[in-house]
Amino acid sequence: MKPSMKVRLFVLSLAAAGLVAAALPIQAQTTKQAGPAIHSFKVTRTGHGRPMILIPGLVSSGDVWSATVEHFKDRYECHVLTLAGFAGQPAIPAPFLQTVRDDVLRYIAENKLDHPVLVGHSLGGFLVYWIAATAPDKVGPIVSVEGVPYAGALMNPGATPESSRAFAEQMKTMYAQLTQEQLGEQTRAILPSMITDPKNAEAAAAWSRTSDPATAGEAMAELMTIDLRETAAAIRTPVLLVGAAGRLQDDVTRKQVTAAYEAQVAKIPRHQVVMAEHARHFVMLDDPAFLFAAMDRFLGEASGSKPETKQ
């Protein structure tokens, strides 16, 4: 069965909003499992120092953070997640995002991680907002790369979880009917809009072919029907949102997109938005120097940062 045109169009619209992700080839590095696997994700731990949790995006392996870990491992103990149903990991029952959120908080508690830095890409960026808003006294600074509190509003400024629900359910049903090969074909078709290097884009498609289509559909449906823009006001640590402007054609469009990103995090008391002018959705791959410089500056300013006491 060939994927329907509606599914293809929806995937393309998600790509425009920065929500379809895949992993890429990585360099070998020394890692170790961080204890027994949590059922909604696998963890590898590398480095030493302050804890940093890195969460990849949709149909991505945690290996997407390889260069980021290499950059930070001499100062941070990097806990890199690969989420259930993605990149060969076993799937879990719905709800997907809430389960991952709760398991990350449990992982922080069980491993006695002291206010870890949270870093997320795309779907992972959404998750770091939710984790921090749910337990604002348990986490440190937050970096979201191309992840926003409510993706639906990027595609349609008037969208709400309720107005998106019917289409989300339809999309979830259609994804459940796809094979892994079909999911891989769809991802491969859109990756050139998300990763500059064609070789990386081609390699990335292979990761989606080891992901569970039903999990991908469930995750996207949940992203369409959970709006964290008000909830995120509970976050009490500094937040850096890194957007990608590499495919934006003119200054007017750049200003509009930047304003849309600013609006997404407007309720977060301490936030910054920076745009990577030469990167597409995978900023950590297209322009790692920009991302690392932005993170170094942000984390330096937030050094030792713990949640502010709510007045």
Model-derived features: positions:
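Bacterial N-terminal signal peptides
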Residues: 11-22
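Active-site loop/oxyanion-hole signature of alpha/beta-hydrolase fold enzymes
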Residues: 36, 79-119, 123, 133
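Conserved HGGG/HGGXW glycine-rich cap/lid loop of the alpha/beta-hydrolase fold
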Residues: 45-90
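Conserved hydrolase catalytic core segment
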Residues: 114-156
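Flexible "cap/lid" loop of the alpha/beta hydrolase fold
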Residues: 142-177
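Conserved alpha/beta-hydrolase catalytic His-Asp/Glu region
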Residues: 154, 158-159, 174-231
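Conserved loop-alpha-helix segment in the C-terminal half of the alpha/beta-hydrolase fold
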Residues: 236-279
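Catalytic active-site module of serine/aspartate enzymes centered on a nucleophile-bearing elbow/loop
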Residues: 268-311
